[in-house]
Amino acid sequence: MGLNCGAEDLPWDEINNVDCAFTSPPYFSTERYNEGGEKEELQSWFKFSEYDSWRDNFYLPVSQKTLDSLNESGIMMVNILDPKVKGKRYRSGDELVDMLKPYFLGQVGMRISQRPQGASVFKDEDGNFDKEAMDKFMKKIYIENVWCFSKDKTQDLFKHIRRGTLEDFI
């Protein structure tokens, strides 16, 4: 069965007994998938133009439904950064953990290379493209959060590397 819809419109009542769900939802409007393309109206950034609407009608409900779809020992991992739009940081990671705190197992950092930027970002003092500046930028390594959740709180994904718990930081 092929589906062509947003994640918030999936037939969630038919999705169950999932062992592992790994998702990297769009960072609100900072990642505009399929912009200008066919069916761009299905994208969450298009449907929900304000952060609160995106969070309340897409991001958190889909996260909850994904968790609900897990089997009793299933794991859900969510890779998301706090989006920054027009200078304002939206704490989507905190909102997710706050909502799913009873199921929170921990957080890991995913090491990634820098994402490409447009050539216009890398200009020298004369306004010309500066390849050396771009190459230096692209060699940087970043860490993105992966939040881990499960219905089974006896699971310990991090027992071999644990140095503290969430409670230690509260």
How should each PLM-predicted stretch be described?
Residues M1-D9:
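Conserved SAM-binding strand-loop segment of SAM-dependent methyltransferases
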Residues D9, N17-P61, K84:
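Mobile active-site "lid"/loop adjacent to the S-adenosyl-L-methionine
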Residues N57-T66, M99:
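Short, conserved SAM-binding segment of the class I
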Residues L70-M76:
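Short glycine-dipeptide loop
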